[in-house]
């Protein structure tokens, strides 16, 4: 069980570290999956990373329609917070920054929650990863208009997305646990 006194702050720090490591690991998993499945190297993309309209790279398609949810979020932040319109060359790194920031912060919240409700760490974080997938990719991203609805994607996209988030959840928990033992 637990070999330390609960501390929300220490849990949050451990979770932030776990979330960052998990975001990187998820990114690497997605890059490998994509290379195997399609022979490309595009990474950091589950359903939230799919264009909201049309298909990838369709001729004549507006580039704004091809932007994934992380790029769309980065564009809104850049414009509304910094007064800067993202250039085409800035979109990929800005989208990756959103991916890592969201994954890191989510990990921090998970780490804090693990301190007060240790049951969330059950099954090495896999239920956490599945829940994160469901709430983020399947519900929130479409509701915010950042991607099409879940029924617009083939089952293979959902499998890819769920597998990616299971990798995230497992890595977040194992990393959080290791860091928390040190704190």
Task: Label every PLM stretch briefly.
Residues 1-183:
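Short amphipathic, positively biased membrane-proximal segments
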């Amino acid at each position: 069980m637990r070999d330390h006194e609960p501390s929300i702050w220490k849990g949050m720090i451990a979770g932030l570290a776990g979330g960052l490591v998990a975001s990187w690991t998820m990114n690497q998993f997605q890059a490998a999956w994509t290379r195997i499945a399609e022979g490309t190297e595009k990474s950091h993309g589950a359903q939230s990373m799919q264009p909201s309209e049309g298909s990838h790279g369709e001729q004549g398609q507006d580039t704004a329609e091809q932007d994934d949810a992380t790029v769309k979020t980065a564009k809104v932040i850049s414009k509304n917070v910094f007064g800067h319109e993202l250039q085409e060359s800035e979109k990929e790194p800005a989208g990756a920054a959103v991916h890592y920031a969201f994954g890191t912060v989510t990990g921090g919240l998970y780490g804090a929650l693990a301190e007060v409700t240790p049951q969330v760490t059950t099954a090495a974080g896999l239920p956490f990863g599945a829940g994160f997938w469901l709430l983020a990719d399947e519900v929130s991203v479409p509701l915010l208009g950042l991607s099409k609805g879940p029924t617009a994607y083939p089952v293979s996209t959902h499998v890819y997305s769920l597998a990616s988030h299971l990798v995230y959840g497992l890595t977040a928990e194992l990393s959080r646990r290791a860091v928390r033992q040190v704190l």
